[in-house]
Regions:
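N-terminal Rossmann NAD(P)H-binding glycine-rich loop of SDR-like oxidoreductase domains
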Residues: 159, 167
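Eukaryotic N-terminal low-complexity, Ser/Thr- and Lys/Arg-rich leader segments
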Residues: 1-11
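NAD(P)H dinucleotide-binding glycine-rich loop of Rossmann-like/cofactor-binding domains
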Residues: 55, 94-157
Length: 223
């Protein structure tokens, strides 16, 4: 069963009408999304912008939605409608969500298992930027590397979203963290997130020289 939204209602969205340049996406009116019995309708108040969003617009991502579509993998907002089979959510709940695309819209419908409650002390902006950064780092460090307190973790691109999340997660496990960055400002940011040591890399270094610097300053047991 589909719960229909009143016809004529429109919402604003960033729309990719055909794969191509990022500059070709448009801000336009689209139909208010319907929901089925296992979906929730969310009024989006914040959305995360990530590298895969640029790839999907250009048709370079691992899957291609049917055009036109609205990009955006993650966001946060307020539940406005719930499907008849949805459990754990009600209208008015604060949530953050993960989706393949569609977050760059005023409203989105997602399966209720893709939405999660957002604490009152957590802003919509923070909730909307958590999945792609912390999710990526958690998968790499916890699910793949089996991180533990006796490991030393080397984080390349330490001052980026995924890098900062990696520092945060690694420190929560008691690991020693070395962050690699390109300037002092980024190094200071990594230290604020808990990095034990930072390495500032000169962009002019070739691959061999870079490897030697990392071995010397980070240590051979860094992962």
């Amino acid at each position: 069963m589909v719960i229909a939204i009143k016809k004529g209602q429109l919402v604003k969205a960033i729309v990719c009408e055909e794969f191509g340049k990022i500059s070709d996406i448009k801000w336009k009116d689209v139909d208010n999304p319907n929901i089925n019995e296992e979906e929730v309708l969310i009024r989006v108040l914040a959305a995360g912008v990530n590298y895969p969003d640029s790839l999907i617009v250009q048709g370079l991502y691992q899957f291609k939605p049917m055009v036109p579509f609205s990009p955006g993998h993650e966001g946060a907002g307020i539940v406005e409608r719930v499907g008849t089979n949805v459990t754990g959510f009600k209208e008015g709940d604060r949530v953050f969500f993960l989706t393949n695309f569609g977050a760059f819209s005023e409203k989105i419908s997602v399966h209720y298992t893709q939405a999660f409650h957002l604490g009152l002390k957590v802003s919509f902006e923070v909730g909307a930027s958590a999945f792609m950064t912390y999710g990526t780092s958690y998968h790499a460090l916890v699910q793949r590397a089996n991180i533990s307190a006796n490991k030393k973790v080397l984080v390349l691109g330490g001052a980026g979203g995924v890098g900062l999340a990696a520092i945060d997660i690694a420190k929560s496990f008691g690991s020693e963290v070395v962050a690699v960055v390109s300037n002092k400002k980024k190094a200071n940011l990594c230290k604020e997130y808990g990095a034990d040591k930072t390495i500032i890399i000169d962009d002019s270094l070739d691959e061999k020289s870079l490897t030697e610097v990392l071995k010397t300053q980070a240590g051979s047991r860094s992962e």
